[in-house]
Amino acid sequence: EFGPLAHPEQVQMRVAKRAMMLEAGIAPYPVHLDVTDTIEAVRAKYDGKLEAGEETEAMVGLAGRVLFLRNAGGLCFVQLSAGDGTKIQGMISKKEIGADSLKQFKQLVDLGDHLYLKGRVIASKTGELSVFATEWAIASKALQPLPALHKDLNEDTRTRKPYIGMIADENIRNMARNRSKAVASLRRTFDDHDFLEVETPMLQTLHGGAAARPFTTHMNAFDLDLYLRIAPELFLKRCLVGGIDRVFEINRDFRNEGVDATHAPEFTMVEAYQAYGTYDSIGQLVKELVQKTAMDVYGSHKVTLLDGTEYDFGGEWKTISMYDSL
């Protein structure tokens, strides 16, 4: 389980630390910090280019989520993670920031906090790329403890609190990024073929375009019963009637039916229509959409799912007529 009721003592300790910060005049959620660099950019520039123990004069200011803390007396080590999972080590030394600041660091910083570090880029004695801090600040004080990063979350937590899954599982974060890449790729391909993107009504007086049970609502202004759309088809076809010869929409649809791992009550649908086309032309378009999306997201026509299943979308696709399929 995860949440305040599951870890009351940890939450209370974090709330107390936030109170300490406020009493000391330290903002637990500062409006601005001098973040001049990203963890990804520092990694890209220096990773593998410094010898163990080598120091540079390059100053950086970066922030990330605290995933690891180690207290070694006059020196503390912290691991910061960027949103994409890129990590970097921070080193906070009494010699560099002073005894009072180091004491405050040990008192206030917890796993899950977002931490700002400003300092020099170095390689530790073990060769780990690090930021040797001259300044530090809590960018956002976390009141909830992190989930156990080495354990799988239960399905209920993953479903009801997807943000927890994103923290715990890099694959889930990557899925969100890949979805964004896929949608952008679809739009580029449609645009290359002169399709116009439109947004059609979500609230409709008639639920058509598919056979599904709709969600219902009521518009008070017109005293009118309405449906959340189950498909955009009817309004897209009206665009064709109006003279838009190639039209598409990427948007949400709603169906008040069964829910399982592959069916959600609200979901994104891609739908397109083309005047003067044939089933051959739309088939070629679908193939191109899938192949280009695979390349843009994975860099290959071969796609491996999380369960290990592999699909190869490359080359020519086999075709079969509707008559032969029956």
Residue ranges, per PLM feature:
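Class II aminoacyl-tRNA synthetase catalytic cores and aaRS-like
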Residues: 1-326
